[in-house]
């Protein structure tokens, strides 16, 4: 293990802040489709969480976020350069662990990492020629769904579960990832400060694309057009932000966004068809439901 004092402090910052750990939990859950006692399963779960943590350090720099998991972000404490390098070290550590899990696991992790980065790139550069909603969903599949899909697949692969389970688990994870992010969009508007670890409307003010705003752009009534003009003006003042959040909370696009998240969770559950009936399948279905029932 690397004993560099600063890196130890910075890389443990978000670990100690908590979090849901939903990705490694999914790896452990899917391992019960095979021999869940294999040590490689624990290593796979570690790879998933290290990769996820690395992306958080980079995401927070790109989003200029002040809070993560209710604590100050790494870059707000140590600066952008240190935060970026901390993310790099976490990716390096994930690569070290996955290198011991065989060629296939290594390739799957590398392919997922590429998708993850491209998803982030496409979100950053923005949409040019594609339908805005289609583009957004594809970004979510790549940026979030890909790693959740890998989490499920590695659990099955490294527990020597049936080969035929890997494809449906990949589809499940990707759909759950989309549902998760769509609920995040809703939570950004609906949450109280202490529920989600960030202030309501954080993404809204940062002009980060979210489903409610994408759906709002399709509306033509006067109230929707006026609200969109307010949002597009930048929400510089707290009063404007609070006004936009209040209007969005009561707007039909919120219910439409929740319905979309629920539909992706249902799609995730439908993808589990090839899996055997039993406790693992039931737990995966409950996992998909929990993603859209959360409020923080």
Language-model regions: role of each:
Residues 115, 175, 233-237, 250-251, ...:
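A short structural micro-motif
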Residues 2-226, 289:
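Mg2+-dependent prenyl diphosphate-binding active-site environment of isoprenoid biosynthetic enzymes
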Residues 167-170, 259, 282-286:
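Short, charged, amphipathic alpha-helical segments
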């Amino acid at each position: 293990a690397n004993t560099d004092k600063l890196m130890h402090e910075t890389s443990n910052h978000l670990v100690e802040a908590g979090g849901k750990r939903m990705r490694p939990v999914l790896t452990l859950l899917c391992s019960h489709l095979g021999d869940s006692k294999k040590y490689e399963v624990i290593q796979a779960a570690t790879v998933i969480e290290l990769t996820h943590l690395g992306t958080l350090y980079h995401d927070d720099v790109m989003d200029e976020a002040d809070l993560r998991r209710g604590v100050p972000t790494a870059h707000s404490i140590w600066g952008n350069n240190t935060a970026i390098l901390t993310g790099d070290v976490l990716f390096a550590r994930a690569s070290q662990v996955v290198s011991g899990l065989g060629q296939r696991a290594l390739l799957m992790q590398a392919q997922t990492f590429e998708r993850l980065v491209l998803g982030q790139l496409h979100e950053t550069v923005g949409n040019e020629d594609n339908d805005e909603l289609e583009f957004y969903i594809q970004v979510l599949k790549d940026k979030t769904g890909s790693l959740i899909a890998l989490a499920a697949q590695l659990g099955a692969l490294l527990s020597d579960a049936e080969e035929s389970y890997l494809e449906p688990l990949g589809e499940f994870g990707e759909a759950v990832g989309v549902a998760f992010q769509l609920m995040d969009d809703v939570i950004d508007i609906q949450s109280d400060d202490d529920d989600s670890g960030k202030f309501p409307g954080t993404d809204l003010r940062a002009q980060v694309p979210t489903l409610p705003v994408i759906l709002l752009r399709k509306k033509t009534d006067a109230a929707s057009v006026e609200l969109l003009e307010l949002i597009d003006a930048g929400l510089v003042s707290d009063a404007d932000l609070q006004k936009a959040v209040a209007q969005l909370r009561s707007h039909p696009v919120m219910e439409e966004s929740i319905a979309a998240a629920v539909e992706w969770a249902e799609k995730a559950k439908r993808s589990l068809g090839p899996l055997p009936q039993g406790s693992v399948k039931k737990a995966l279905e409950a996992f998909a439901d929990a993603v859209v029932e959360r409020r923080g």
